[in-house]
Each structure stands twice: as structure tokens, then as C-alpha cells.
């Protein structure tokens, strides 16, 4: 099923029993976080707080609190269908020459569809039904969550940040958290390798004395939101990818105060500029690691204009010790990553990012091993192939007889197929998430690879053990006897 805007999605979720309206007054200060956290841990519904204490704007939380709802948002009926999206992205990332005329003819509709998904620009849009400027710009009127007791200030969490570099035609979409500093200022926390930060750096190099235009959309349609967190090829815009997910072109409208184009159906849009040299200390905030992060300096975004729907909904989330909403997103997007990795490394059977590993800090890979040193090649490939894995600290590689998603299997492989000295790969001075306070230097640390595969000649001089397996005939015989044994 496809959704034209956030409200269309909410209606569909409500019809499925996947949305709960909360009419009891609830505070966005701490209380919503606790309610959403308990609900997510029970795989509960999305929550629409209709009476947030102190505000007249409803708050939407836990929207992507189950992998199934992420799949719904991407236009799929089941999480397993997300692998098809991964196969599409793998093909678009590295298209293969057609094997013949028939193959070229078969692929033609796909590429025609991609080319037809350029965004559609409207003259008028729901996101600009109300326009607030000057002294009317006041973030204090938005029910921005204050998530944890030690947080520095309320935090905008689901802001879809729209930027464009000075040398680029297409825009970048990214989700970056934003600490509220005052009536019209937030801190734009984007890590240095993210698209928004790269666009801003290029702008500062080319126009060091000019303010940088930025727009932030809150409450976009699910395909556009999820397109911003999916590994889209650099040649494909997130807006075009969202159109592919939705099955229709993404509708945009020109921002009131800049040339940026924003989602026409968004609930709220913040428009403004980052002024040269204006920085501020961000944090501390409770983060997806389960800890409060260190204070660090980031650019300040000055909001000059708020446009919104007349009856806008504020979309929010929280981050904390897994599972949280980013961890759930990671579980679902894991299925998208698998075909992309397999396109580059066909020997990969499965790839798993355990949610307990904060979505990306640990990966388990199963392979069809073909030669000595193969596991090490795969480790290095995972770290370097997609920028989503540049912060992955631990990569475990094992054989395809192991279930990557079953810790009992993985731990057995590690403890029986590894020699700690021979089979551990350590790499120093690599990029690390600055939120990782375990690293010796902010943003720079080490990585560990664990080779838990069977060892081939050249990797060991010893006879390798043979795994114990029962005789299949005996297993079948016991299957027949089992109902008679009274053991169930």
C-alpha cells in the first residue's frame, strides 16, 4: 500500500490497529519518553498524544516502533519484502551491462520508472497553509520533547534536514537532531561525514561570508522520511527514491525564503540560515548508546520562518539504550543492506546488525568460504563498501552453517573456530562515532574483526575438527516415534 502523506499513513495504521490515540493529558517533558519506551519494548502501536500538556498540537510517537511498520512505511506488506528494495538499490548502485537484447528489454521498464520519478514541484502546498515570520517564530509553541532527566534542553529528533551544496543540483536529505536554544535557534548536530555537513563545508569554502540556507521538515510522508535513512546511491536523489517506494512522484514546493524544495505534504517546515562562524555547545543528551553523550560544538541554525498545516501534527521520537526506534529501524533496514552487500560480495549468505549493538556497532556476516584469508577480505569490505558501516566497531565472520541471527550459533562458532591471536584483526586510527566515549580520542578509534570460520590449509597446520551430526535416518525414525513417547 502506498501513502501520499503522513495522515494517509496514520489512517492506514489505525485501520490495522497499529495506531493508538491517547486522550489523557501527557507531558512532553519525560512522560512521553517513558510511555513510548514501554510501548516499543512490547512491540506496541504508534501513539498519537492528542492532549500534550501545555500545547494545542498533537504529538506523534513510536511511529516506526516495529519492523513491520517500517515495512508498511516503505510500501511493503512484510519485512521480508524489503530485500526486493535492497536488490533494486544494488542494481541502481552498480548497474550491470545487459546480457543480451532480451535482458536489456526486461530492464528497460525499471530504468524508465526511475527516470520518471523526478519530483513534482507544486505552486501551493499544505505545508504552507500557515506562515509565521518575525516575532511570531517561536519554537516554544511546538511540543518538542524533553526526553531524559539529564538532557540539556528540548530536542527536535525527527527533523528531515534539507540542504544543497554550492556545486550540486540535487538536494540532500538527512535526519539530524537539533537542540533548542531559544525562540528561533537550534543547534544542527550533523557528523562531519554526513551529507548535510559536507554540503555546508563546501558552502563555507566557496562563500565564507554568506549565510547558508537550510530547511527542516517535520512530519513528512513515510517514504520520504525512510528514504532519508536508506543507503541510496549517490546518483539517485532521496526524493526520487521516495517516489519509487510510493509509486508516485514526490510532491515538493519551493521554500518561502530560499530556493530549497521541501515536501509539500509535511506537517511543519522550519526555514532559515546558518550564519558564518555561529557555533554552540551541544548536549549532553541521552543517546542510542544508552548513555549521555559528551558536549561538542556544532553550527547554530537560525529559524526565520515556520510554515505548517493549519492543524499540524508534531512528529517526535527519543533515543536510548536499545531497543529504541533507531534500533528498530536498523532491524528493518538490515534487510535492505543484505542484497546491496551481496551484489559486491556474492559469497555473503547473510548479514546481521544486532539491535543490542546500537544498530551499527557490530555486524555478523556468514559466508561461503572459498580460500584462506577470505574472512579478512569480507571484514575489510564491510568497513569500506558502504558509509553506513564506517563506524561499525566489530565484524564477526563465520561460515554459512551458522545462523547469523542466533547468538547461540554465533558464540559456538567464535569459541570453537577461533584462536584469539591468529583470528583477530585489529585496525587502529579509524573513524569512530564521536558519541562512542570508549574510543581513546573523539572520532578516532580502533576496529576488531573476528574470523570464526573453519580454517583452511595455510591458516592452520592441524587437522580441523568435523562437526557432529546425527544420522538422518535416525532423525526420521525418532520423528515418527516422538508422538508415542509422551514427551510433549
Swiss-Prot record:
**Entries under InterPro entries matching the protein:** UbiD, UbiD-like_C, UbiD-like_N, UbiD_bacteria, UbiD_Rift_dom
Q: Give the protein's cofactors.
A: prenylated FMN; Mn(2+)
Q: Can you tell me which residues bind Mn(2+)?
A: 172, 238
**E.C. designation(s):** 4.1.1.98
Q: Which UniProt keywords apply?
A: Cell membrane, Decarboxylase, Flavoprotein, FMN, Lyase, Manganese, Membrane, Metal-binding, Ubiquinone biosynthesis
> In which domain of life is the source organism classified?
Bacteria
> GO cellular component terms?
cytosol; plasma membrane
Pathways involved: Cofactor biosynthesis; ubiquinone biosynthesis
Q: How does it sit in the membrane?
A: Peripheral membrane protein
Catalyses which reaction(s): a 4-hydroxy-3-(all-trans-polyprenyl)benzoate + H(+) = a 2-(all-trans-polyprenyl)phenol + CO2
Q: What is the annotated localization of this protein?
A: Cell membrane
What the record notes about the co-factor is: Binds 1 prenylated FMN per subunit.
Q: Where is the active site?
A: 287
Q: How does it assemble?
A: Homohexamer.
Q: What does this protein do?
A: Catalyzes the decarboxylation of 3-octaprenyl-4-hydroxy benzoate to 2-octaprenylphenol, an intermediate step in ubiquinone biosynthesis.
What protein name does the entry list? 3-octaprenyl-4-hydroxybenzoate carboxy-lyase
Provenance organism: Azotobacter vinelandii (strain DJ / ATCC BAA-1303)
